[in-house]
A protein has these predicted regions:
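N-terminal Lys/Arg-rich, disordered targeting/topogenic segments
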Residues: 1-30
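Structural motif
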Residues: 88-90, 126-130, 165-171, 212-224, ...
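Aromatic (tryptophan-biased) beta-strands that constitute blades/sheets of beta-rich domains
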Residues: 53-71, 93, 97-106, 136-142, ...
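Repeated scaffold domains used in trafficking and secretory/extracellular systems
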Residues: 67-76, 105-116, 144-155, 188-197, ...
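Hydrophobic membrane-insertion alpha-helices, especially the h-region
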Residues: 30-49
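Structured, soluble extracytoplasmic/luminal domains of envelope-associated proteins
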Residues: 99-154, 278-281, 288-306, 310-314
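Hydrophobic beta-strand positions that form the internal "hydrophobic ladder"
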Residues: 80-81, 118, 156-158, 201-204, ...
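Solenoidal tandem-repeat scaffolds enriched in leucines and small polar residues
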Residues: 167-265
């Protein structure tokens, strides 16, 4: 009997021990949940504070004296500054130190960048350069005047040239070797006005105006230079026609996504092999300007309100409107910076908006403002204006 009683006691003790262990585990789990919830709440509070915070001034961290830059244009390229004019191009860091430069003579220099490569070409001329962060990779001379050029992420360039009523699209690799060529005859009433090259250089789109029917239609043709396109006539993997619409601009924003901007809509095409129309964003009226990067697209409309010269709307590529704001700045440019913020730049004033519609920063300057660029780090920017280039931190 004693043994049986002892067995019950041991069994009871084990049950009590297991219950104590369960209670202890529950306490630990509750503490972990409380700590995690507190950390998440703190993170959200900090994130909201940062997202909604506005700035009215800045500290100058570094200032570089600049000569007259009235005839110079500026581009943000790989975190440094490209300055270009009719006489050449200069690539400097934020301290004003020269990384490289290239002299040339162009009547209308244009710069296009894609990740770590860029091209500078003379619109209406015959000169084109392929460049990267180290300098010139290749200089290409075309036989006929250049209408448009674009570049892919590995340095491949597509060039639209014209001679009389004939138009040619040529593809060159980073070493200047011709990879492909196509001809479009103006006498057939299809006149190319723009081209777009995917980041991987495997797909090319040609935007044409069709005036054969006595009215203005637009035609976009897609070409694939990979294995899929080799099975199609002239590598053509799709053509879209838009009646009574003028499409002046097309652009690839990734390997597989292209946008087309018409006088009525913005069309978004997707497809790694054969692009298909994914989304159409209806425009309220004629836009003054359009700006985009690989995540978002924005438009600016004229505003009849004397206090607000323009109305800005921002969309994702699914057509969802993310923000809209009015600006009183008579802007020279509206663009995304490398931090996905919207920068509005006027002669002597600028604004920075977040994609959530918060006016993060507004400032007026004593001198003419040429360029506003984001610099890596929290609230770091570069202001380029008449007489100086300043690296600043908002406060």
């Amino acid at each position: 009997m004693a043994r049986k009683s002892d067995f019950k006691t041991v069994e009871t003790d084990l049950d009590e021990l297991e219950e104590k262990i369960r209670k202890h585990r529950r306490k630990i789990a509750k503490r972990i949940i409380i700590v995690v919830a507190a950390v998440v709440a703190l993170f959200l509070i900090v994130w909201l504070w940062m997202a909604l915070r506005t700035y009215k001034s800045f500290d100058v961290k570094n200032s570089v004296e600049q000569k007259d830059k009235s005839a110079v244009s500026f581009v943000d390229f790989c975190g440094a500054v490209v300055e270009y004019s009719n006489d050449g191009v200069l690539y400097t860091d934020s301290d004003g130190n020269r990384i490289w430069n290239q002299a040339f003579e162009m009547s209308s220099p244009q710069v296009v960048t894609c990740e770590s490569f860029m091209t500078i070409y003379d619109r209406g001329g015959t000169d084109l350069y392929i460049m990267d962060k180290k300098g010139v990779k290749k200089e290409i001379g075309t036989s006929w005047p250049i209408i448009k050029a674009c570049i892919a992420s590995q340095g491949t360039v597509a060039v639209l040239v014209s001679q009389d009523e004939n138009y040619y699209v040529k593809l060159y690799d980073v070493n200047g070797k011709e990879l492909a060529s196509g001809e479009f005859f103006g006498e057939q009433k299809n006149i190319p006005v723009d081209i777009a090259l995917s980041y991987d250089a495997k797909k090319l789109a040609v935007d044409m105006i069709d005036v054969s029917g006595g009215k203005t239609d637009s035609v976009i043709s897609f070409y694939n230079f990979g294995s899929v396109g080799q099975n199609e006539i002239d590598n053509n993997v799709g053509t879209y026609k838009y009646e009574n619409q003028l499409i002046p601009e097309i652009a690839y924003v990734s390997d597989s996504r292209m946008i087309a901007v018409s006088d009525q809509n913005i069309m978004v095409f997707d497809g790694s092999q054969k692009p298909k129309l994914k989304q159409t964003i209806k425009l309220e009226k004629l836009i003054d300007s359009v700006f985009y990067n690989n995540k978002y697209i924005g438009v600016a409309y004229s505003n009849n309100d004397k206090n607000c010269t323009s109305h800005i709307k921002l969309y994702d590529f699914n057509g969802k409107m993310l923000m809209e704001n009015d600006t009183a700045i008579a802007y020279n440019s509206i663009e995304f910076d490398s931090n996905n913020e919207v920068c509005v730049t006027g002669d002597t004033a600028c604004e920075i908006y977040t994609i959530h519609g918060v006016k993060k920063f507004y400032h007026t300057f004593d001198n003419k403002l040429y360029k506003l660029m984001y610099k890596s780090g929290m609230n770091n920017y570069i202001f380029i204006y008449d007489g100086a280039m300043d690296e600043v931190r908002l406060k």
